[in-house]
Amino acid sequence: MNTIHDQAMNYVYQQVLQRLLSFFSRAERTALQLLIQRLVVAAGGMERMGEYKVMVTPSGTRDSCYMLALLRAAQLSIAGRAPATFQLRVATLRRSESGTAALNNMHRSFAALFLYDDPRVELLMVEHRQVLPFNHLAPLGMDSANAHRTNLLMMGHRRARGEKLEWRDDACLARAEFYGQIARWSNGVDAWLASESPRRQKQFVEDLDRAVQKAGIGALKPNSGTFDELFALLDGLGGDLYRGFYSESERQCWRPEGGFESCRRTTFVDIHDMAVGNLEERWPLLSEFLGFEAEEWVFHQGEGEYADPLIEAHLRGLEAEFISDRSYEAGFSEHVQRMLANMQLQRVPEPVCEQMIARLGQRQTTEELREAAASWLHQTYGLNEAQWVCLLFTPFIERGAGLERFLRSCHPGMLVALPDLHRAMQGLHGPEQVMQWMMDVSGLPVRLIGHLYAMEPLPAHGAARQTLETALDAAGLDGSGVGDRSVER
């Protein structure tokens, strides 16, 4: 670049900074100065800032877009007062459930913050273990969707008896693998910045410990339960956290090959204490400056966590109907009550609670909501209701210990083929119709079903995770109608 162009761009960047700062409160400006000081110390002094590379991994949520804006303000503030500022790597993980709203939110944030075309900034997207330039318009590849579906099923079928189906196992494993590899790619980064609280850091590490055990690659080494040791833990696990499920020829390597050999040591910089104020105070920055738009079905589910309550309630409804011999409506309504109680405990704004009730309890019948959830799950993962029900039963692990119960409950006509099913899962010859039925009902190829057949379930997770549910049960949340319960503090 020539000097005139550099001067022009520096002027543009300073204008962006001034507009960004105009949305900051006094407390946020103080937090910005503390963030700058923290980065200077981590880099080893202002004179080394130009060589320092920082990574963030936004997901398109309100919190991630807000923290990116704060970090960009720090980068541009340092650029205005020092010879050089830090380099920034912005990397996002693309998965089947990565909705267009989240990608569009990130794109609008990147554009508003002038991250595109800034040579100090890398904008990356990882899909199916391939590092690509960020592109919010790129469709999800078929290979990526197929791999994600298979990983989700394999992790889900490794649940302990009586353990509820949750999204966190596969999501946690995928994100951990992503963090470890994207931090090493192309000469690596010096620091990863994240705003998770100590409680959420501990929860992630605990979830990761259980997830790697489900994936068949052992347990984590003893650790402090914080992100300070996360990269050391990930280095010890290796780059392929799903290798316990697949043969060497079936595994997909990280690409571009040879780009993940960096020995640069990545440290964690905790910025959870930099998020000051509340959502109402941040909303002008999010909506007017960053162009953030929330999808109608996204509700706040606690500290920095976002989920689709319709899908979660749908799965609980299926569990009630097929596993617990209750009605779908009872399981669905009970879970909505639990989510609402959790939101109240987290002091989520009243209008948000009321919005969830209106979305899930009044305007549509339960059958309409069930159809909407089933349609989304099929479009997103390519799995029909019968395949989700199969996953709820986990009939294949432990040498098919739960297979007969599954057949009696859902497919009594296949009981006559029970011996053939066991032989097929043992890798022996079986009737073609039986093999095809196994694939149709599970969504998995027979060879992977056979792999599950030889695996043991993990022990139950323990009583800790059930503490909240026990407390909610004691409070009388017994699955009564959503619309019958007022939202009171």
Q: Model-found features: residue ranges?
A:
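A phosphate-binding catalytic loop at a beta-strand-loop-alpha-helix junction
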Residues: 46-80, 286
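Nucleotide-activated chemistry modules centered on ATP-dependent adenylation/adenylyltransferase
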Residues: 1-51, 87-111, 117-489
